[in-house]
Amino acid sequence: MKLTLEKELCGSILDIGGGGEGIIGRLYKSAVTAIDNVQEELDEAPDCCKKLLMDAAELDFDNESFDNVTFFYSLMYTDTETKEKALKEAGRVLKKGGRLIIWDYVITSAYPKAFLAELEIEFSGETVHTEYGIIGTGVEQDAEMLIKFCEENKMKMFEHEKYAEGFKLGFIK
């Protein structure tokens, strides 16, 4: 799948699961605080933004700390309970009027066969080829599940793009 990213966010950004390729950090640079719960993923990410080891389900930030919160293909690595908690925490640290943006895949099964998907991302004159994958039970997800969790936390959807294998969701607090 091919995805082109443009700068669409203004202000501070919390990128949840921002290790690895660090796409949001590379696009928005110093505006980003990237968190990941795996130190090796943070170490792998480019040094273009602030990086912190942290659990998305228990964010160590004050209420309404960020103008934007992003999940760039990171919720797929969590079980349903953690997805719900992470989205609740995202809403807590998001400023009133702030935006929550989610890019992710529809996953109907990741066991016994792993879920794997290739992604080509174009942004700021760069092209990154990567593959995301997960194996296990309880990681199934679709846009409707995430929409429900966000709406339960008083976020209003303003964008829903469908891709061949996934989706992009946008919410305002």
Predicted regions mapped to residue ranges:
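C-terminal alpha-helical "lid/dimerization" subdomain adjacent to the S-adenosyl-L-methionine
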Residues: 105-161
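A short glycine-rich, Lys/Arg-flanked "PGG" loop and its adjoining helix->strand segment in the class I
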Residues: 84-96
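Class I SAM-dependent methyltransferase SAM/SAH-binding core
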Residues: 14-58
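A short SAM/SAH-binding and catalytic strip from SAM-dependent methyltransferases
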Residues: 68-82
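Conserved beta-strand signature within the Rossmann-like core of class I S-adenosyl-L-methionine
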Residues: 97-105
